[in-house]
């Protein structure tokens, strides 16, 4: 029975071997389950980036990253810190402030690919996550460590 399950899982998730992380300049922000209030201009200005997990010709996962030199606890701090770091050219921390996927397995894979991509570009990768059980479980399952519990958010850190 174990061999059958192993084979089934291999077939079911084999597509993950064929994905790549790409820099994208457009995403339908209304599909963002975490921060749909942040418009496209916010996500692509002041050095902020949108990365997509591409499988064949489809984006199956999205991660939005801002570059700062400190750890924000609110969206306002994220905005201000990323602007300051952009102008001073001194960012050392990648802040993943939203992650979502359209295909099972893509959420975990996009974080793995983002960590590989950001290694050497940032000293650390930290999240600005909502205070929800889903966000907590996602980050803990993917190997992150809770470093701050804030009034409206939480920060997790991933090892690069």
Regions found by a protein language model. Give the residues of each.
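Conserved acyl-donor/pantetheine-binding loop and adjacent beta-alpha core of acyl/acetyltransferases
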Residues: 64-95
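Conserved beta-strand-loop-alpha-helix junction that forms the acyl-donor binding cleft
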Residues: 101, 126-137, 150-153
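A short helix-loop-beta-strand connector motif used in the catalytic cores of GNAT acetyltransferases and
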Residues: 40-61, 66-73
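Conserved GNAT-fold acetyl-CoA-binding loop/helix
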Residues: 18-38
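Conserved catalytic-core motifs of GNAT/GCN5-like acyltransferases
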Residues: 145-158
């Amino acid at each position: 029975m174990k061999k059958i399950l192993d084979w089934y899982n291999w077939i079911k998730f084999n597509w993950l071997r064929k994905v790549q992380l790409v820099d994208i300049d457009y995403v339908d922000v209304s599909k963002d389950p975490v921060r749909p209030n942040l418009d496209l201009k916010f996500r692509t200005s002041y050095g902020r980036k949108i990365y997509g997990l591409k499988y064949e010709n489809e984006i199956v996962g999205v991660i939005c990253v801002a570059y700062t030199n400190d750890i924000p606890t609110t969206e306002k701090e994220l905005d201000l810190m990323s602007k300051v770091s952009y102008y001073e050219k001194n960012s050392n921390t990648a802040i993943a402030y939203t992650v979502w996927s359209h295909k099972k397995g893509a959420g975990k894979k996009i974080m793995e690919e983002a960590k590989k991509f950001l290694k050497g570009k940032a000293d650390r990768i930290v999240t600005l996550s909502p205070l929800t059980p889903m966000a907590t479980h996602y980050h803990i399952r993917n190997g992150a460590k809770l470093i701050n519990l804030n009034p409206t958010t939480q920060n997790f850190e991933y090892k690069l």
